[in-house]
Amino acid sequence: MNIYDFKIKDIDGKELPMSKYKGKVLVIVNTATHCGFTPQYEGLEKLYKQYHKKGLEILDFPCNQFANQAPESNQEIASFCALHYKTSFQTFAKIDVNGKNADPLYKYLKKQKGGILSAIKWNFTKFLVDREGNVVRRFAPNVEPEKMSQAIEELL
């Protein structure tokens, strides 16, 4: 099994195959609208604008598992991000990243970088995936998106 075998849900709950992103460099991030790290949306958007034409996609998965910091609906979250941070990368449906209801994609990501018991510790944990679908790096929530530039450039 690899990352392209998974299905994810868009903002409207419609299933999409991860294979849609074959050949792209991915930053997969769990986010929240009321978190101390929420201003990282700005840095994520800068990365997206800088590298999108070279093949970068940012996949934003809101998550309400950490201190109820993403209580809004999927649509409200997407609107918030677009309004306050001018995000243009794709926001997906809200998911769980830990526990028995953790999204299968996140179970896979954690297993690839951190081991099966390596729980997501907070919002804005970022995974970097190469063009072949390999999970190559995991960045802690406190790592600002701009600090990922070199790692992204190496994969582009």
What is the predicted role of each segment?
Residues 1-156:
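Chalcogenol-based redox active-site neighborhoods
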